[in-house]
Amino acid sequence: MSDIYLQHLMTIIVSVFLRGYRGKTVDFSITSQHHRTTVAYFLNHGKWNDSALQKALKSSIVELIYQEARSSGQPIFCIVDDTIASHIKPSSQDLHPIEAAYFHQSHLKGRQDYGHQVVSVMLSCNGITLNYAVILYDKTKSKIKIVQDIATELPEAPVISYFLCDSWYTSAGIMKSFLEKGFYTIGNRILYPMGIRQKASELALRIRKSDPNVSLVTVDKRRFYVYRYEGNLNKISNAVVLLSYPEECFGNPKALRVFISTNVSLSTQEILDSYAKRWSIELFFRQSKQKLGLDKYQIRSSQGIQRYWLIMSFTHYLCCVCKGNHCTFEEGYFYLQKQLKEERITAIYRLIQHGASLEEVLTIAG
C-alpha cells in the first residue's frame, strides 16, 4: 500500500475515536489533510489490495485464537449471524443509489427493512472474541454457501470446537462442512425426529414436567425446564435436541426454544452454556452500530462498502489487542480514545510553547 493510501487508512481508523463518529466522509475530513472526497475515492475506486489486508487480518486472528486453544485446551467457538445495516430507500429519481441494497426481513423490527445484509463471523476461545469476517450478502451467493466457504477456509481446530448459529444456518451441509474441520454444531433448529417432519411445538404439547427426560437447568441465573431428545434427525444421524421453556412459562408455545447439538456427549447444561456464548456476536453488532458506524455510513459503491467494513473489522481487532494483551472491544476503544486525546493535547501544548497562531491551534484541536 502506498504512503498516501496508508494515510487514508489511518485517517479512517483515527476518526472512529472522535466523538460523534458516524462513518460518513465528513468524519474522515476532520483527521485528514485531504478533502473528504479524496478519502471516499480511496474506498470506492482506489487501486489498493484490500484482499491482502483481509488475508493478513484473518491470519492474525486465527493464529491468536488457535494458539489460545492449544495452550488452554478450551474449545474454539465459531459464531455466525447476520444483521441489517439500514438505509433510507432512495427515490426513483436518484441517479446514484447505494449499490447492493435490498429489502430484507428484519426479525428485530418484525418487518421488511431496506439496506445491506451483513453476515458476520466471530472466533472465540477462553474469553477472547475477535471478528474474523464481515461479508456482504448481495444475493449473488446464498448465505448458506457463504458460511460453508468460511468453514472450508478455516484450519482444522486443534481441540474439540463448536459452530454456534441460529436456525438459518443449521443445514445439514453447513454442519457437515464444520464437522470436517473439527467443529460440532450447537444451534436452533426445527425438529425432525426419526426422519419424520414434526413441528417442535407439536412434540412439546406432549411434554410434562414429570417426564424423565425433563430437567431443570440454570443458565445465566435463569432457570429453564428442558426436554432432551437424542437420536436420528432428518439428514443428521445421532444428535441431541433440547426443547426449552423458562421456568415460569412452561407449556407456553411462544416461550418454547429449540436447540440442537451434534455432539451427543455434551450434557444438557453444557449445550445451553455453550450456546449462550453466541451472545458475543449480538454484542458485536450493537457495538458496530454504536461506535463503528455500521448503519450510518454514506458510501455508495459495493466495493467501497466492503472495504469500509474491512477497515472497521481491522479497527475492532486493534481495540481488542491494543493494550499488549487481550481486552474487550469497549475497553480497547476507550483506551485508544484516551491515548489519542492525550496525544492531541500534547500537540496543542507544544504548538503554544513554540508560539503557534490561533488558527494552527484550532486546526489541531479539531
Segments (PLM) and residue ranges:
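Gly/serine-rich nucleotide phosphate-binding loop at the start of the catalytic core
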Residues: M1-L53, L57
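Active-site-proximal, Lys/Arg-enriched surface segment
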Residues: V16, H45-N126, Y227-G231
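Basic, amphipathic alpha-helical segments enriched in Lys/Arg and hydrophobic/aromatic residues
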Residues: K296-A347
